[in-house]
């Protein structure tokens, strides 16, 4: 349960959900999102988890058991996490760099733009992937053990920052940005809420099927899916309360995405909580990363008959190599574009 919850709780919870909520009607968006979670998110999660438990196999083999022609759906469910992780681990590497900077100098790197333009990012990308590989290497037990430590720590740190943030003078502006109803239900806000449900709960990405294949027959799937969706939504709301009051108090731009975490928020939070914001970011990144890696590892084990050790090593190294262009796309490979996007942005857009 905690491993599946960790897969759903990702970096997007820290900046994407609160920002979408603020830009698409505030409390109105939240209501729309919760309705979609109940009528689509949880049912789809239950279907995927039930399929995984019924077959006990990876996404490709699971869909093949349902119908041979449905195998292609499972193939896309394996390819997507493979590509996403190559991009995700680059950001994970940035986070580790920031955590180490705080641990050694009690400060963030001076220039985020200069840092991501340097080849050094490849090293941190490697370190992050090595951690994900080490956890997946130990199998489901290793993933569950890591999640039991990281998820509670994540919530504790977030609550600490949340309490400090709402006590800032002028914090009400940030809270109004998130929660104040703004307009009615528009097509764009409904579309944003629907897309966020599938993105945030990691639906149709093979993750839920993979974790479902590890569930015992005694596990209550409706209850588990409800708890996962509830934890994911709660963390996203907590993140908004923790981050956006400070963003508005200090006159920052709320729609910066990753740049908000790495470029501007360190200046805001260093006097408040030091590197805690990056500890939170690391916990969300690593739990999602091991879930993404586990999908392709499970595929290699079930479809190709590989041992876990071989699958984790080969797939992990392959993902690392695939992520190198993204890591270098702000510097050495900065002139290379795909449809007018940098390699990093193009992979992220996919």
PLM-predicted stretches and their roles:
Residues 33-42, 77-102, 123-137, 152-165, ...:
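Hydrophobic core segments of alpha-helical transmembrane domains in multi-pass membrane transport
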Residues 1, 119-123, 231-237, 275-278, ...:
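Loop-to-transmembrane helix boundary motifs in multi-pass membrane proteins
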Residues 37-49, 53, 57-60, 128-137, ...:
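Central hydrophobic cores of alpha-helical transmembrane segments in multi-pass inner-membrane proteins
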């Amino acid at each position: 349960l905690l491993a599946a919850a960790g897969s759903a709780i990702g970096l997007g919870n820290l900046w994407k959900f609160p920002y979408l909520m603020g830009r698409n009607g505030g409390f109105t968006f939240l209501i729309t999102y919760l309705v979609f979670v109940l009528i689509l998110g949880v049912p789809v999660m239950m279907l995927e988890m039930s399929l995984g438990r019924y077959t006990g196999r990876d996404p490709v083999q699971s869909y093949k058991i349902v119908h041979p022609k449905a195998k292609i759906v499972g193939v896309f469910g394996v390819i997507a996490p493979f590509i996403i992780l190559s991009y995700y681990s680059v950001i994970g590497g940035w986070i580790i760099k920031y955590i180490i900077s705080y641990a050694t100098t009690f400060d963030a790197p001076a220039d985020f733009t200069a840092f991501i333009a340097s080849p050094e990012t490849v090293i941190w990308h490697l370190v992050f992937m090595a951690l994900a590989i080490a956890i997946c290497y130990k199998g489901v037990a290793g993933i569950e053990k890591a999640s039991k430590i990281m998820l509670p720590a994540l919530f504790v740190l977030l609550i600490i920052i949340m309490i400090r943030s709402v006590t800032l003078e002028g914090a009400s502006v940030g809270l109004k940005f998130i929660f104040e109803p703004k307009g009615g239900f528009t097509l764009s806000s409904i579309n944003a809420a629907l897309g966020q449900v599938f993105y945030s709960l990691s639906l149709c990405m093979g993750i839920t099927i993979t974790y479902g294949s590890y569930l015992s027959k005694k596990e209550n799937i409706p209850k588990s899916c409800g708890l996962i969706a509830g934890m994911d939504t709660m963390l996203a709301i907590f993140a908004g309360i923790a981050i956006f009051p400070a963003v508005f108090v200090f006159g920052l731009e709320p729609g910066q995405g990753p740049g908000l975490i790495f470029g501007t928020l360190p200046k805001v939070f260093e006097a408040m909580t030091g590197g805690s914001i990056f500890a939170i970011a690391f916990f969300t990144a690593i739990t999602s990363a091991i879930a993404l890696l586990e999908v392709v590892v499970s595929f290699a084990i079930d479809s190709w008959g590989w041992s876990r050790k071989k699958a984790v090593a080969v797939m992990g190294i392959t993902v690392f190599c695939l992520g190198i262009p993204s890591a270098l796309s702000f510097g050495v490979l900065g002139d290379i574009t795909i449809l007018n996007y940098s390699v990093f942005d193009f992979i992220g857009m996919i």
